[in-house]
A protein has these predicted regions:
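Active-site phosphate-binding/coordination module
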Residues: 22-122
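Hydrophobic packing residues within well-ordered alpha-helices of enzyme cores
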Residues: 24, 49-53, 162, 166, ...
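Short, structured coil segments at secondary-structure junctions
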Residues: 61, 69, 170-172, 226-227, ...
Length: 268
């Protein structure tokens, strides 16, 4: 029995205008009112997606969000951390060494803000990520704290060849995923959205047999594979669609709502 619906945002729940459609909003609100837990799963911090949380009414004491691609499970009302997994500064040193050798712009994030390393300008992350503090500093001044991830954010034309040339030993040091055409993320090795969802399911006394997930990209792969119902958008990547329980319509054609309307017909 499905008790939780977990949703990626970009190119999944959100349309190309970065909006939740009226149809998707209506269906998810109805499920939430019927006691189904609706959980947004994102690589972003909670402040950056707060308008979507409010739009869906996910502000009850038992509402949670999976942020930082599973690195932080946070209560929407109290902001208490149910689960977190990060990296030390020393874990980032291999990546620092590589971007220095190639002069690639890099951002690193803790669980509250973005550190924009200004050694090599050109990052477009400020235009992509809203409602979060940015602090510019040189790589030499990076503080000794816990980090959620590192991000290369440059135009797809520049990023694509960089990804193709990433050394295997560097990728092996992290859970490296391309979350959007202009974003490459470097996460803790064992981190993914499925890990965050497992912590949340455990909290409620449930398991993956009670989970439905929606996604489209590489950073959704593990949660699509783990869930009893792993649903991928028609616009999703071929390798992600290959492990899906089912394929639904595109993000611009209310794919989330269309699938839920069929699956939860007796509730809606």
């Amino acid at each position: 029995m499905i008790k939780m619906v977990a949703l990626d945002l970009d190119n999944t729940l959100l349309n190309s205008n970065k909006e939740i459609s009226q149809r998707n909003e209506r269906v998810l609100k109805q499920l939430h009112q019927q006691g189904i837990k609706v959980v947004l799963c994102t690589g972003r911090p909670i402040n950056a997606i707060w308008p979507y949380i409010e739009q869906l009414g996910l502000t009850d004491p038992e509402d949670y969000t999976i942020t930082f691609n599973g690195g932080l499970v946070i209560n929407n009302e109290s902001r208490e951390h149910l689960f977190e997994l990060g990296m030390k500064k020393s874990d980032l040193l291999p990546l620092f060494s590589y971007v220095k050798s190639k002069k690639i712009p890099l951002n690193i994030l803790d669980f509250e803000r973005v550190y924009e390393l200004n050694d090599y300008p050109g990052s477009i992350y400020r235009t992509v990520l809203k409602n979060i503090e940015f602090q510019a500093l040189p790589m030499s001044d990076v503080p000794e704290i816990t980090y959620s991830k590192a991000v290369m954010a440059i135009t797809p034309e520049k990023l694509s060849p960089i990804i193709k040339e990433l050394p295997a030993e560097l990728k092996a040091h992290y859970h490296a995923v391309q979350s959007q055409p202009m974003i490459m993320e470097f996460l803790p090795k064992k981190l993914n959205k499925a890990g965050g969802l497992k912590a949340l399911l455990d909290h409620f006394g449930d398991d993956f047999s009670n989970l439905m997930t929606f996604g489209d990209a590489d950073n959704d792969l593990e949660m699509i594979k783990a869930a009893a119902q792993g649903i991928v958008m028609e616009n999703g990547l071929p390798n992600v669609k290959a492990v899906a329980t089912a394929i639904t319509d595109t993000n611009d054609n209310d794919g989330v709502a269309r699938y839920c309307e069929r699956y939860f017909a007796t509730l809606l």
